[in-house]
Amino acid sequence: MKTNKNISAIAIMKKKQSIDKEGARLIRALIIISIIGLLAMFTNKASAQVRFNVQGDLVSSYVWRGMYQTGASIQPTLSFSVENLSLTAWGSTDFDGYRNGNIPSANKELDLTLAYTFPKLGLTVSVADMWWAGQGAGKYFDFNNKTTAHHFEASLAYVLPVEKFPLSIAWYTMFAGMDKNEKGDKNNYSSYVELNYPFSVKSVDLNVTCGIVPYKAPQYYTNGFAVTNVALKGSYAIKITDSFSLPIFSQVIWNPRMEDAHIVFGITLKQ
């Protein structure tokens, strides 16, 4: 005969499984709704201008939000947009591959981002699916909130309506997926806030970045408020011919929280 404690434990386990299943259903629903929304845009506004963007960056190292990820990498981008709605696929992979026999060791990432911009308000809202399990990890299509290797993140970005002071601020929060607490039963809701200020000096485009973590977030190795990303980026296009220029960039990055610093060089190829 089952005791009340056993019955309670079984009930709790079933409840957790139900929650995990609901989380997986929610994520699948978001993906389906996004696809349907894009198809509806094409169907209802066939005459709307569709814009595609294809490009790739070759970088000396991959640093994400002030944190070193891996060495030299290729980072391709494929995106398309209809009016103010866009869908972007961005990825990164280094050159490690299967260097240790059959053991996969490459750093591999694929991020999918659905975004909508409100031009008159200067606002952009987006939802991203970030997957960086690496080469050979498999289970890409595991969307169970308890076992998935995906990180799902929502963001809100705002650009000040001041032409001479185009400061932007963005807030990112992971709301589902692998961003879990130590027990693995609750989301951490790790958040990151970033300010960017672009400007130009002669023919060089510059951008100053300051990124902070507002509260405890193991994802960023913080126990509370911390500055994790201070950077200065410079971009310049080298003229090769009258019809072709090669964009290059360098970025100096400091992470006060980790007491670390990086410098990255990159080349961009785009249509």
Q: PLM features: residue spans?
A:
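Outer-membrane beta-barrel domain signature
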Residues: V63-Q69, Y98-P104, G136-T147, M174-K186, ...
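Detector for outer-membrane/organellar transmembrane beta-barrel domains
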Residues: F143-P218
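Transmembrane beta-strand segments that form the barrel wall of outer-membrane beta-barrel proteins
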Residues: V54-Y62, L85-F95, T124-A133, Y140, ...
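Short loop/turn motifs that connect adjacent beta-strands in outer-membrane beta-barrel proteins
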Residues: A46-R51, N84, P119-T124, P161-P166, ...
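Residues that define the transmembrane beta-barrel architecture of outer-membrane proteins
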Residues: V50-F52, T70-I74, A106-L110, T148-A154, ...
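Glycine- and aromatic-enriched membrane insertion/assembly motifs of diderm outer-membrane
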Residues: T70-M130, L195-L206
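Outer-membrane beta-barrel "beta-signal"
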Residues: L232, I238, E259-Q271
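Cleavable N-terminal export/targeting peptides
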Residues: M1-R51
